[in-house]
Amino acid sequence: WERIQDAEQIVKKAQNLTDYFLDKYQDVERIGLTGQMHGIVYIDKNGKCVSPLYTWQDERGNLYSENGDSCGEKENAYDEIGEEKINEVKIKKTKGISLIEEIQQKCKLKTASGYGLVTHIYNMRHSLIPKSATSFCTIMDYLGMCLTGRQVPLVHVSNAASFGFFNGRKMCFETEKLNEMGIEEKWLPEICTDVKKLGTYRNCTVTAAIGDNQASFLGSVGNKSNTLLVNMGTGGQISILSDWYFEKDGIEARPFLNRKYLLAGASLCGGKAYALLENFFRKFVKEATGQDKPLYKIMETMAEKGKEFDARQLENRRLKIETTFDGTRVSPELGGSITNLFSDNFTPESFTYGVLEGMSRELYNMYQTIHNGTDIEVKHITGSGNGLRKNKVLCEIVEEMFGAELVLAEHEEEAAVGAAISGSISNVNTCKNC
């Protein structure tokens, strides 16, 4: 249920690429950083990583134990965590709920499995935190430490908020609520609201990492208002710039730059839904013919035919596929569904189109939540991610559903562009602990 990666290998490859580009382009002055949000690595007092990367896909916060208790709960709340003991917090047994549900009930906070502090709570309760660990940060924060020789992490608010237990209005961690869950403030990394200078690497200024959602928005939309960024990768995501803080079920107000927010909604399956369908078709073809080849080109043709067929149907005769195959952040137990299935639409063409339409509709419903709560109107749509770049029919569906023209982002690696921009506009004053 945990989703882990080799943090040292990731950083080694990133540093090798950095060296390659610095050798090739001699005029580089600044290095901006970004990477996957939510996940964490543990750091020791010398600034060295002492754990794998626990990614955003970690599902342990949704687990229940066999005896019906919260799976985040220890039988003995005073088990040793490294060399220390939890000696001030008495954790009550809670019957039949997951750690996520326990947090919601006890702290009145909505968070999600895979968020860094949820992972940390689970690890703490199961004695999984390395004895030498003193704090944690994102993988890109750790890269910044390795490049500059920092011994303590500095986390931009765009990443700090992705850990959960974060007050986006006050731009600080919810320390009292963390205490209720047994987390001491000493674990929390230092945070910054501006993109601060971390230090230098090969005479280049290295700046604090920003979240990949914020970097993608900055690299494709910039600071434009009324422009919706639709990203379709493994997951799906919408983001739009706001001067005001707004949150509701499924919508987060993520700290951006210049005290603004990105109102964001994310689907857990997204482009993965289309990949699941391709794998389904591919398995059948392999059994029938012995051939095992990608079928995306064929599926594109089928999607076009399915779209044409769907346009001729009455609304109550149109195939509807809910692509929540991995649940949602609000309802992780939710599954997908197929409705309005009739003999004339029980076809590969309708299923292919139906999955694409379902992927888009899940994001559109999130936008409706934003619009109803803020009156923000979408006038332009910027598309990013291979799910859109490689699927003309999906682009057409998004345009028709959202009622605006979709323009693909100029640069394919939008987050990398955004990271570079963040480095160029950052406050070069070094943070106090650099």
Give, region by region, the residue ranges found by the protein language model.
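Short glycine-rich, Thr/Ser-proximal phosphate-binding strand/loop in the N-terminal lobe
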Residues: 1-7, 48-61
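N-terminal phosphate-binding loop and adjacent alpha-helix
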Residues: 1-27, 64-68
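Alpha-helix C-terminal capping segments
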Residues: 17-25, 126-127, 197-202
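Short beta-strand-loop/turn "lid" adjacent to the catalytic site in phosphate-handling enzymes
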Residues: 23-56, 106-114, 144-168, 192, ...
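Short loop/turn motifs at secondary-structure junctions
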Residues: 27, 184-187, 360, 377
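Short, conserved acidic/polar surface loops in the N-terminal third of protein domains
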Residues: 42-46, 66-68, 241-242
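Active-site core segments that coordinate phosphate-bearing ligands/cofactors
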Residues: 62, 71-110, 117-152, 164-175, ...
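A conserved helix-loop-beta module that forms one wall/lid of the active-site cleft
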Residues: 178-196
